[in-house]
């Protein structure tokens, strides 16, 4: 493993093949446009290249399709053992992300449990918001729960504010 290189695990990337499996021609077009014939679920891929596929799905097929890809992530990506409650699942999303992406500045997911029925998730992982929301939906669905309704516009605005704050902090750090 080259820790200087940002990489994304094929098992997580493979979620789009599974989620869009009913539309094989769409999957084949996405793969061809990305310059590959297939996604190997056991291989590591360039992080930015992999994330660009998710953006392409959102751009060409739409946000609902990308959310479906995110929901499928729990079936194809590596998740740590012992996630036997919704609270453990949410708290484990950051670790799960680190099992599927590696290298500098790939981000993470931080969960703060507010009480027995609510949590706050901070996603610094790069990628489309709808993918992240789909991952959250798929994770919650494992336990018969559904995340509260958040609009894509709210998530985009929060991400924009977060990136602006990160830039401000970097500018003042010695």
Name the predicted role of every residue range:
Residues 117-123:
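Short, aliphatic-rich beta-strand segments
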Residues 130-147:
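Short, non-transmembrane amphipathic alpha-helical segments
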Residues 123-131:
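Short, well-ordered coil↔helix boundary/capping segments
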Residues 1-114, 127, 151-154, 158-163, ...:
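N-terminal accessory segment detector
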């Amino acid at each position: 493993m080259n820790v200087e290189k940002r990489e994304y695990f094929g098992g997580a990337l493979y979620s789009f093949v599974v989620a869009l499996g009913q539309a094989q021609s769409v999957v084949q077009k996405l793969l061809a446009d990305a310059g590959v014939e297939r996604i190997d679920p056991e291989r590591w891929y360039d992080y930015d290249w992999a994330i660009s596929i998710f953006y392409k799905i959102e751009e060409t097929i739409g946000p609902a399709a990308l959310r479906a890809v995110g929901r499928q992530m729990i079936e194809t990506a590596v998740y740590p053992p012992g996630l036997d409650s919704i609270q453990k699942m949410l708290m484990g999303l950051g670790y799960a992300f680190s099992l599927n992406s590696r290298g500098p500045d790939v981000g993470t997911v931080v969960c703060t449990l507010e009480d027995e029925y609510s949590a706050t998730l901070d996603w610094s992982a790069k990628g489309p918001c709808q993918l992240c929301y789909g991952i959250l939906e798929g994770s919650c669905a494992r336990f018969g729960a559904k995340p509260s309704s958040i609009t894509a516009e709210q998530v985009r605005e929060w991400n924009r504010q977060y990136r602006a704050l990160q830039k401000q902090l970097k500018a003042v750090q010695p």
